């Protein structure tokens, strides 16, 4: 009986811990990100568990706003904006959310998606 209770406790603890893990993407630097926003070619390093199929399956819905080129070797997604406006760049947040990404790290600082947009993509 002791082993069964311990097994359940271990299972539920692991499940809760896994469910609370935030998926985080990152950007090389704020300078590179700002240059990307200006040029309409924004690079984001996605979590390693995302596959090219995952990225492609979500990217197809956002083609009116941007195209996504995904390098599976270094997990870098390059967003090529169709129309480089703040409104179109906001749609990147939908793509990231669809891929279960909740935060983005830039220069060692972690940003929630809305804060990331306000600090980097909106300008």
Regions found by a protein language model. Name each.
Residues 24-30, 59-66:
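Short amphipathic beta-strand starts and helix->beta connectors
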Residues 80-123:
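Surface-exposed, polar helix/loop patches in the mature regions of secreted/periplasmic/lumenal proteins
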């Amino acid at each position: 009986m002791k082993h069964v209770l311990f097994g359940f406790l271990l299972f539920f603890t692991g499940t809760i811990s896994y469910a609370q893990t935030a998926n985080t993407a990152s950007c090389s630097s704020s300078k590179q990100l700002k240059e990307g926003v200006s040029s309409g070619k924004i690079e984001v390093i996605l979590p390693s568990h995302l596959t090219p199929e995952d990225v492609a399956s979500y990217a197809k819905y956002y083609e009116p706003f941007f195209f996504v080129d995904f390098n599976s070797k270094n997990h870098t997604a390059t967003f090529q904006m169709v129309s480089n406006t703040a409104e179109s760049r906001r749609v990147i947040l939908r793509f990231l959310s669809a891929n279960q990404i909740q935060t983005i790290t830039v220069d060692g600082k972690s940003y929630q998606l809305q804060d990331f947009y306000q600090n980097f993509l909106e300008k």
